[in-house]
A protein has these predicted regions:
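Glycine-rich, basic loop-to-helix element that forms the pyrophosphate-binding segment
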Residues: 76-92
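Short beta-strand/loop segment that forms part of the nucleotide-sugar
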Residues: 43-52, 72-77, 101-102
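Membrane-interface aromatic/basic loop that binds lipid-linked glycans or pyrophosphate carriers
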Residues: 278-332
Length: 332
């Protein structure tokens, strides 16, 4: 790991550390960095983790670091986004952490609003809404009046976030988090969907959440993203992430959420099964069927007896003869 440090501690008061994992994003990186550097809140350091980029992203990071003394650049061999985030937290100087993806754009007042909401409410995390699209909307940079609401992150409230798909509840952005919370829940390395795996834990250990009710984070949607690409074994990490959520709620003895996540786990596995059949991916199909059998056995206690949809679909895959009999007898 090579670290280029251009930070002058006498010039800046470091209140927030903004961590940006960077990998092959030369097309959008400048726009992202400019939006961060144009924040109305200035007491931050910017940590750029170049995760072994093969394009000019690393050079762009160094170029900005030469001009802006609050930027630290880390060049490392490719280790993945989770390791990049964890390494950024490790070297950060502030008590608050913010993660920004390197192809995204943030509103000029985002950091000011989040920090003020978190500190005024004594919350461990503050969050805003995000806008997901291929292009930035015309009114994205409009002015807002500062306001926030506070929510406790007890298990019942996490359930509400999950049901409403609120704040993209499992993701570490768009938010600021106390460094102590981020350190207590490091991102699992070597996996994708790592934010899905630990997002609910970050919320829980924050104790309370300050919510700024505006869309102040632009999440750049990739038109050739995961949903439009052929399946591979790595994408099955989503199932692993859901299992991590189940394990977390098991530790809290919160059966209701275990049931909800198990339902999503089985549904997602059935979705992957259908994708494998459609793409004639027999090798991956074997893995999916094996996973499905294990999930049904391991988490059977969380599957409602009345859920005939899951029963019908899993019987059709794993027990086709029983499926045909039940269908004739109209048991489903």
């Amino acid at each position: 790991m090579c670290i280029a440090v251009n930070y002058d501690s006498n010039q800046y008061k470091v209140v927030v550390s903004i961590i940006v994992p960077v990998y092959n994003v030369e097309k959008y990186l400048r726009e992202c960095l400019d939006s961060i550097l144009n924040q109305t809140f200035k007491d931050f350091e910017l940590i750029l983790i170049d995760d072994g980029s093969k394009d000019k992203s690393g050079e762009i990071c160094d170029e900005y670091a030469k001009v802006h003394s609050n930027i630290t650049v880390v060049h490392q061999n490719n280790q993945g986004q989770a390791a990049a985030r964890n390494n950024g937290v490790e070297i950060s100087k502030a008590d608050w952490i913010m993660f920004v993806d390197s192809d995204d754009v943030i509103h000029p007042d985002l950091l000011q609003f989040l920090y003020k909401a978190a500190t005024e409410s004594n919350s461990g995390m503050a969050v805003t809404e995000r806008f997901k699209s291929e292009t930035i909307p015309d009114d994205f940079f409009r002015q807002y009046t500062f306001e926030y609401a506070v929510k406790k992150t007890i298990p019942e409230k996490l359930e509400e976030f999950y049901d409403n798909k609120q704040f993209y509840y499992w993701a570490p952005f768009p938010s600021i988090i106390k460094k102590s919370v981020a350190q207590s829940v490091p991102f699992p390395e070597g996996k994708i969907y790592e934010d899905n795996a630990v997002g609910c834990q970050l919320l829980y250990y924050a104790n309370s959440l300050a919510v700024v009710p505006y869309c102040m984070y632009f999440y750049r949607e990739n038109p050739s993203g995961t949903m439009n690409q052929p399946l591979n074994e790595k994408k099955l990490d989503y199932l692993w992430a859901l299992e991590e959520q189940i394990k977390f709620y098991e530790e809290l003895h919160y059966v209701k959420m275990c049931k909800k996540i198990t339902n999503e786990l089985i549904g997602s596995t059935l979705y992957y099964y259908a994708r494998c059949k459609k793409e004639n991916n027999d090798k991956l199909l074997e893995i999916v069927i094996k996973d499905l059998k294990r999930f049904l056995k391991q988490y059977r206690r969380y599957i409602e007896d009345k859920d005939k949809v899951i029963e019908r679909k899993t019987d059709r895959i794993l027990n086709p003869r029983i499926y045909r009999i039940k269908k004739v007898l109209k048991i489903y």
